[in-house]
Curated annotation (Swiss-Prot):
Molecular function GO labels: rRNA binding; structural constituent of ribosome
Annotated PANTHER family: 50S RIBOSOMAL PROTEIN L3 (PTHR11229), LARGE RIBOSOMAL SUBUNIT PROTEIN UL3C (PTHR11229:SF16)
PTM summary: Methylated by PrmB.
Entry GO terms, CC: cytosolic large ribosomal subunit
Keyword Transmembrane: no
Source species, domain of life: Bacteria
Protein task: One of the primary rRNA binding proteins, it binds directly near the 3'-end of the 23S rRNA, where it nucleates assembly of the 50S subunit.
Name of encoding gene: rplC
Protein name from the UniProt record: Large ribosomal subunit protein uL3
Family indicated by similarity: Belongs to the universal ribosomal protein uL3 family.
Keyword field: Methylation, Ribonucleoprotein, Ribosomal protein, RNA-binding, rRNA-binding
Keyword Nucleus included in the entry's annotation: no
Amino acid sequence: EFTLGQEINVDIFADVKKVDVTGTSKGKGFQGGVKRWNFRTQDATHGNSLSHRVLGSIGQNQTPGRVFKGKKMAGHLGNERVTVQSLEVVRVDAERKLLLVKGAVPGATGSDVIVKPAVKA
């Protein structure tokens, strides 16, 4: 369909109703469990003086005596490949080389994205 070095315009999306957009999400650095995984916070009062935003218990008992792999904990948030599916194409402006979509496009302003016709539409 395409050859190496061929220029591709937004005209190819003229008859497409929905698209999938892939980009790199904004990096947030090292974040705790409340922001990263939407964990609930602990009591502000009632005897709690130090651990308002900590995870709480992360294991079971003497058996298994360890924390399972994949446990949701604090760590790096964002700066990863994200695909938003089935965004509606509002308008294709060929002369200004613009593709207008309705919805959240992943990544910072001005970052590169990959746009494909929607898989599930």
